[in-house]
């Protein structure tokens, strides 16, 4: 059973919600307003590893979405505008080198994806 705990916040009527796995580890913590995710949210796997951080506005992804490798290094960063990819989306190798970059407008890729190999050399 997932245990939910609501904590009241003093900022702009937001509440903070936390959810836990059966083993007691935190599943997520998120700011909510009017029953919608609103603000920053962080998600962990069952072993306690941070897997992503997401920014929400009125229940929609709005801002950055960051995914992490189990090692803690950044796997990807994408920008969203009301649930649609908008701006740069970058993937990284676990060593921190860029893997790919794609630019989006209104959830549509508008430029060719640039790709790199693990050494940082552009692939053609």
Predicted regions and their residues:
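Sec-dependent signal peptide recognition
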Residues: 1-4
């Amino acid at each position: 059973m997932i245990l939910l705990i609501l904590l009241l916040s003093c900022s702009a009527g937001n509440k903070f919600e936390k959810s836990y796995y059966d083993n007691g580890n935190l599943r997520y913590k998120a700011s909510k307003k009017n029953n919608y995710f609103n603000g920053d949210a962080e998600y962990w796997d069952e072993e306690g590893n941070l897997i992503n951080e997401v920014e929400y506005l009125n229940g929609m992804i709005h801002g950055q979405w960051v995914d992490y490798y189990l090692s803690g290094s950044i796997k990807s960063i994408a920008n969203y505008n009301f649930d649609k990819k908008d701006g740069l989306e970058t993937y990284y190798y676990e060593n921190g080198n860029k893997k790919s970059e794609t630019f989006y407008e209104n959830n549509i890729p508008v430029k060719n994806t640039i790709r790199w190999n693990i050494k940082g050399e552009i692939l053609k």
